[in-house]
Curated annotation (Swiss-Prot):
Protein's name in the database: Conotoxin Bt11.1
Domain of life: Eukaryota
Localization: Secreted
Propeptide intervals in chain numbering: 21-35
Signal sequence bounds: 1-20
Disulfide bonds: 39-53, 46-58, 52-63, 57-70
GO molecular function: ion channel regulator activity; toxin activity
Family: Belongs to the conotoxin I1 superfamily.
Entry-linked InterPro entries: Conotoxin-I_CS (IPR013141)
Record remark: domains: The cysteine framework is XI (C-C-CC-CC-C-C).
The organism of origin for this protein: Conus betulinus (Beech cone)
Tissue specificity annotation: Expressed by the venom duct.
KW Nucleotidyltransferase (keyword) present: no
Keyword annotations: Cleavage on pair of basic residues, Disulfide bond, Ion channel impairing toxin, Neurotoxin, Secreted, Signal, Toxin
């Protein structure tokens, strides 16, 4: 348990120690810019592969699961 807490503490503190800057694509950054795009779930209407969540592809205007990936459509 103590090891887990120590590991999480290191992950939280490490970026500030090494001078890491927060990414532009953080949730707070996206909210500030009004960029509130959300991915679409299985069966929802889409226009392109990037509209669909994770492993889903846009095929015939719907987000679907494919066996061969999105690049083949």
């Amino acid at each position: 348990m103590k090891l887990c807490v120590a590991f999480l503490l290191v992950l939280v503190i490490l970026p500030s120690v090494i001078g890491g800057k927060p990414s532009e694509r953080t949730l707070s950054g996206a909210t500030r810019r009004g960029d509130r795009r959300m991915c679409l779930s299985l069966g929802q209407r889409c226009e392109r592969h990037s509209n669909c969540c994770g492993y889903l592809c846009c095929f015939y205007d719907k987000c679907v699961v494919t066996a061969i990936g999105c690049g083949h459509y």
